[in-house]
C-alpha cells in the first residue's frame, strides 16, 4: 500500500525526523489559506499522487507570493500529471501539499528496503539526492552505498556513522544524521513498511538536515495491525479493478496485454503468464482466485477482467488440489451466463474432480475451448485472440 508525501511526512514527524512545515489542500482556496497560515516568504506547491518524478512533470513548483500560490495551485489541481512512473496516461492531481521553502545547500538520498537475499534490511544511501536513484545507479553506481542491518541488533551508532561518512556528510552533520538514520530504521520496522525513502534529505547552509520528501510502501499483509496507516489509503490513486477485486479477496494486478487470466495459486498464475508470452501472447492481468474460490468469486473475477476493453480472450488454468475442478467449472458456467461472454474462453483443468469438471463444461452448451496442457491452452488462446 502506498501513501501520499504529506502523509509520509506526518509519520516521519511522529518518529522525530525533521520535516518542513506543510499543510495539505484540496482546493485553490485551501492552498491560499495554507500559504497564508505558513507565512512564507517562499512556499513549495506540490502535487500529491502515488508516483515519483513529479518535479520533472511540472507537479512541484516554487511560489514567492500568495498570488503565485493561487496561480500554481490552479494549474496543478486537476491536471493529468505524467511522470516516468505513471505511464503515458498520467494520474489526475486531486490534492496538493503547500510547504515551507527550504534553504538547500546539498541533497542526499536515503532509503530502507528488505533484502530477501540476505534476510536483512538494506539501508541504501547516496550523495546524489534530488534525482532518480535509478539514473544514479546506472550512470554512477559508485555513488551509492548499501549497508545491511541485522534485524536482531538494529542500526547501531557505528553503522550509522559509516553511512553518514560514506555519503560525504560533513562532521557538523554527523550526529544529527545518526539520529535521523536510527529513527528512520525504527519507523521502517514499527510501521511494517516495505520501503521508506527520503529523496532528498537536505543539508542547509548551517549543516542541519531535513527530509524534503517522503515515500512509503507498506506490507499489505501487516495492515491489519495498523489501522492508522489504513486510514491514509486513497482509493482514487489505485487501479479501480484492483480495488474491486480486493473486495472479493481476489489477488488482481492489471497488465497491458489482451488475454485475461484466471488461475488458482500465485506460482501457477506467474507460470501461466510466462507461457502465454512464450507462445506470442500478452497477459492482461494477474488474477489468483486462491484455494477457496466460489461460483460468486469466479463470476466477479470474470466481470472485473471484462471491464477492461482490451481483453479479447480469457484463459482459465486450474490445478485442483484444495480447490476442486467441479467447483471452478460451476463458477465458470455461471460467470459465462452472468456476463453474457462474447470473447473466446479456453479452460485447462487438472487435479481433484477433473473429469467431473470437464464433463460439466462440455455439457454446458457454452463455446468453451478445452485444453489438457498449459502449452496447448496458451497456444489456443493466443490463436483465438488474433
UniProtKB/Swiss-Prot annotation:
<keyword id="KW-0547">Nucleotide-binding</keyword>
<dbReference type="InterPro" id="IPR011761">
    <property type="entry name" value="ATP-grasp"/>
</dbReference>
<keyword id="KW-0436">Ligase</keyword>
<dbReference type="InterPro" id="IPR013815">
    <property type="entry name" value="ATP_grasp_subdomain_1"/>
</dbReference>
<comment type="function">
    <text>Succinyl-CoA synthetase functions in the citric acid cycle (TCA), coupling the hydrolysis of succinyl-CoA to the synthesis of either ATP or GTP and thus represents the only step of substrate-level phosphorylation in the TCA. The beta subunit provides nucleotide specificity of the enzyme and binds the substrate succinate, while the binding sites for coenzyme A and phosphate are found in the alpha subunit.</text>
</comment>
<dbReference type="InterPro" id="IPR005809">
    <property type="entry name" value="Succ_CoA_ligase-like_bsu"/>
</dbReference>
<feature type="binding site">
    <location>
        <begin position="321"/>
        <end position="323"/>
    </location>
    <ligand>
        <name>substrate</name>
    </ligand>
</feature>
<dbReference type="GO" id="GO:0042709">
    <property type="term" value="C:succinate-CoA ligase complex"/>
</dbReference>
<comment type="subunit">
    <text>Heterotetramer of two alpha and two beta subunits.</text>
</comment>
<feature type="binding site">
    <location>
        <position position="199"/>
    </location>
    <ligand>
        <name>Mg(2+)</name>
    </ligand>
</feature>
<dbReference type="Pfam" id="PF08442">
    <property type="entry name" value="ATP-grasp_2"/>
</dbReference>
<dbReference type="GO" id="GO:0006099">
    <property type="term" value="P:tricarboxylic acid cycle"/>
</dbReference>
<feature type="binding site">
    <location>
        <begin position="53"/>
        <end position="55"/>
    </location>
    <ligand>
        <name>ATP</name>
    </ligand>
</feature>
<dbReference type="InterPro" id="IPR017866">
    <property type="entry name" value="Succ-CoA_synthase_bsu_CS"/>
</dbReference>
<feature type="binding site">
    <location>
        <position position="99"/>
    </location>
    <ligand>
        <name>ATP</name>
    </ligand>
</feature>
<comment type="similarity">
    <text>Belongs to the succinate/malate CoA ligase beta subunit family.</text>
</comment>
<dbReference type="GO" id="GO:0005829">
    <property type="term" value="C:cytosol"/>
</dbReference>
<dbReference type="InterPro" id="IPR005811">
    <property type="entry name" value="SUCC_ACL_C"/>
</dbReference>
<dbReference type="GO" id="GO:0004775">
    <property type="term" value="F:succinate-CoA ligase (ADP-forming) activity"/>
</dbReference>
<dbReference type="Pfam" id="PF00549">
    <property type="entry name" value="Ligase_CoA"/>
</dbReference>
<dbReference type="InterPro" id="IPR016102">
    <property type="entry name" value="Succinyl-CoA_synth-like"/>
</dbReference>
<comment type="pathway">
    <text>Carbohydrate metabolism; tricarboxylic acid cycle; succinate from succinyl-CoA (ligase route): step 1/1.</text>
</comment>
<dbReference type="GO" id="GO:0004776">
    <property type="term" value="F:succinate-CoA ligase (GDP-forming) activity"/>
</dbReference>
<protein>
    <recommendedName>
        <fullName>Succinate--CoA ligase [ADP-forming] subunit beta</fullName>
        <ecNumber>6.2.1.5</ecNumber>
    </recommendedName>
</protein>
<dbReference type="GO" id="GO:0006104">
    <property type="term" value="P:succinyl-CoA metabolic process"/>
</dbReference>
<feature type="domain" description="ATP-grasp">
    <location>
        <begin position="9"/>
        <end position="244"/>
    </location>
</feature>
<keyword id="KW-0479">Metal-binding</keyword>
<feature type="binding site">
    <location>
        <position position="107"/>
    </location>
    <ligand>
        <name>ATP</name>
    </ligand>
</feature>
<feature type="binding site">
    <location>
        <position position="102"/>
    </location>
    <ligand>
        <name>ATP</name>
    </ligand>
</feature>
<dbReference type="GO" id="GO:0000287">
    <property type="term" value="F:magnesium ion binding"/>
</dbReference>
<keyword id="KW-0460">Magnesium</keyword>
<feature type="binding site">
    <location>
        <position position="213"/>
    </location>
    <ligand>
        <name>Mg(2+)</name>
    </ligand>
</feature>
<feature type="binding site">
    <location>
        <position position="264"/>
    </location>
    <ligand>
        <name>substrate</name>
    </ligand>
</feature>
<keyword id="KW-0067">ATP-binding</keyword>
<dbReference type="GO" id="GO:0005524">
    <property type="term" value="F:ATP binding"/>
</dbReference>
<keyword id="KW-0816">Tricarboxylic acid cycle</keyword>
<feature type="binding site">
    <location>
        <position position="46"/>
    </location>
    <ligand>
        <name>ATP</name>
    </ligand>
</feature>
<dbReference type="InterPro" id="IPR013650">
    <property type="entry name" value="ATP-grasp_succ-CoA_synth-type"/>
</dbReference>
Amino acid at each position: 500500500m502506498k501513501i501520499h508525501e504529506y502523509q509520509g511526512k506526518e509519520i516521519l514527524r511522529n518518529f522525530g525526523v525533521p520535516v518542513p512545515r506543510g499543510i495539505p489542500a484540496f482546493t485553490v482556496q485551501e492552498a491560499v489559506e495554507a500559504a497564508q497560515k505558513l507565512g512564507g516568504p517562499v512556499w513549495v506547491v506540490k502535487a500529491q499522487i502515488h508516483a515519483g518524478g513529479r518535479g520533472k512533470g511540472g507537479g512541484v513548483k516554487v511560489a514567492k507570493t500568495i498570488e503565485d500560490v493561487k496561480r500554481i495551485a490552479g494549474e496543478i489541481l486537476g491536471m493529468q500529471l505524467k511522470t516516468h512512473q505513471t505511464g503515458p496516461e498520467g494520474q489526475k492531481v486531486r490534492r496538493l501539499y503547500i510547504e515551507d521553502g527550504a534553504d538547500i545547500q546539498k541533497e542526499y538520498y536515503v532509503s530502507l528496503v528488505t533484502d530477501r537475499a540476505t534476510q536483512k534490511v538494506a539501508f541504501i544511501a547516496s550523495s546524489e539526492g534530488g534525482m532518480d536513484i535509478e539514473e544514479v545507479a546506472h550512470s554512477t553506481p559508485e555513488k551509492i552505498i548499501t549497508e545491511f542491518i541485522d534485524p536482531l541488533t538494529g542500526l547501531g551508532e557505528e553503522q550509522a556513522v559509516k553511512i553518514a561518512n560514506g555519503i560525504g556528510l560533513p562532521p557538523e552533520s554527523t550526529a544529527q544524521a545518526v539520529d535521523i538514520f536510527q529513527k528512520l530504521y525504527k519507523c521502517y520496522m514499527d510501521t511494517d513498511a516495505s520501503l521508506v525513502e527520503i529523496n532528498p534529505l537536505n543539508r542547509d547552509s548551517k549543516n542541519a538536515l531535513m527530509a524534503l520528501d517522503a515515500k512509503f510502501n507498506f506490507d499489505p499483509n501487516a495492515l491489519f495491525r495498523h489501522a492508522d496507516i489504513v486510514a491514509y489509503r486513497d482509493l482514487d490513486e489505485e487501479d479501480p479493478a484492483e480495488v474491486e477485486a480486493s473486495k472479493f479477496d481476489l489477488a488482481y494486478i492489471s497488465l497491458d496485454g489482451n488475454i485475461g487470466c484466471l488461475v488458482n495459486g500465485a506460482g501457477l498464475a506467474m507460470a501461466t503468464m510466462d507461457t502465454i508470452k512464450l507462445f506470442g501472447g500478452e497477459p492482461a492481468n494477474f488474477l489468483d482466485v486462491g484455494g477457496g474460490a466460489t461460483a460468486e468469486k469466479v463470476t466477479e473475477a470474470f466481470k472485473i477482467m471484462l471491464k477492461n476493453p482490451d481483453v479479447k480472450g480469457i484463459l482459465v488454468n486450474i490445478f485442483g488440489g484444495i480447490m476442486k475442478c467441479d467447483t471452478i467449472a460451476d463458477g465458470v458456467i455461471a460467470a459465462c451466463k452472468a456476463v453474457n461472454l462474447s470473447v473466446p474462453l479456453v479452460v485447462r483443468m487438472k487435479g481433484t474432480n477433473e473429469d467431473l469438471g470437464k464433463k460439466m463444461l462440455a455439457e454446458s452448451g457454452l463455446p468453451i475451448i478445452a485444453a489438457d496442457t498449459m502449452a496447448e491452452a496458451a497456444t489456443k488462446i493466443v490463436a483465438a485472440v488474433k
